[in-house]
């Protein structure tokens, strides 16, 4: 729905603002790969971070963790990104849990190393 997409866009910008404030450089948003995608790709120090945004509304606890199928898609996008750009940084897979209580005020819980490539 338009509302969902609009919320998604705001949430994504909100996460990017947070990352930039923490010193990350945003290199891609909505990276689409063959058989995969990544919401945000950001660089900090020796890490290139592939960030998955998860939404929750009305403080409904942590949504289901990022399932294995989704992890595979993110890892696939990471592999392609690394190959295409020749990026030599250490890949890291993070999750950004965005909550909204009224569709306006967003809050963020940011998880470093939410998963790694070994389990899939």
Residue ranges and their predicted role:
Residues 23, 34-38, 91:
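Short beta-strand or tight-loop elements
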Residues 35, 46-50, 90, 108:
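Structural motif
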Residues 1-29:
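Acidic-basic catalytic patches of nuclease active cores, encompassing PD-(D/E)XK
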Residues 56-78:
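Mg2+/Mn2+-dependent nuclease catalytic core
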Residues 31-33, 55, 97:
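Short, glycine/acidic-enriched loop or turn micro-motifs at the edges of active sites
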Residues 2, 6, 10, 35, ...:
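Residues at secondary-structure transition points
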Residues 38-59, 74:
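Conserved catalytic cores of phosphodiester-cleaving nucleases, focusing on short active-site segments
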Residues 84-120:
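Domain-level recognition of nuclease-like catalytic cores that cleave nucleotide substrates
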